Amino acid sequence: MVAFAGLTSKLTNLGNSAVGGVGGALQGVNTVASNATLQKNILLGTGDSLSVDAQAKASKESDANGAKLIAMQAQETMKKQTMDVLNAIQAGKEDSTNKKISATATNAKGISY
């Protein structure tokens, strides 16, 4: 029963981590979008020039890179969470196997011929 409670606790913590990770990723996306809008508005107010165009291009590339990094981080977080759940399941199975072996050994001690 203790192993089940521990597994339940691990799964609950994992779920909370998933919600926090996705929330953080979404917040990052909103920050990138907000920065892009701000840069666009600043650039629109400065007029046309090669340096303004270069800055706009650099900002766009930087925002695209930031979005890729956020997506990569979210993907890796999901992979880690999956591995954590699989490890918790495996640990529960190993615990059950160890208990069965121990009980069999204890019962065998009482057998005499």
Curated annotation (Swiss-Prot):
<keyword id="KW-0281">Fimbrium</keyword>
<comment type="function">
    <text>Major structural protein of the Hrp pilus, which is a component of the type III secretion system (T3SS, Hrp secretion system) required for effector protein delivery, parasitism, and pathogenicity. Required for secretion of virulence proteins such as HrpW and AvrPto. The Hrp pilus functions as a conduit for protein delivery into the host cell. Also, affects the expression of T3SS-associated genes. Required for full expression of genes that encode regulatory, secretion, and effector proteins of the T3SS.</text>
</comment>
<dbReference type="Pfam" id="PF09589">
    <property type="entry name" value="HrpA_pilin"/>
</dbReference>
<dbReference type="InterPro" id="IPR018581">
    <property type="entry name" value="T3SS_pilus_HrpA"/>
</dbReference>
<dbReference type="GO" id="GO:0005615">
    <property type="term" value="C:extracellular space"/>
</dbReference>
<dbReference type="GO" id="GO:0009289">
    <property type="term" value="C:pilus"/>
</dbReference>
<comment type="similarity">
    <text>Belongs to the HrpA type 1 family.</text>
</comment>
<keyword id="KW-0843">Virulence</keyword>
<keyword id="KW-0964">Secreted</keyword>
<protein>
    <recommendedName>
        <fullName>Hrp pili protein HrpA</fullName>
    </recommendedName>
</protein>
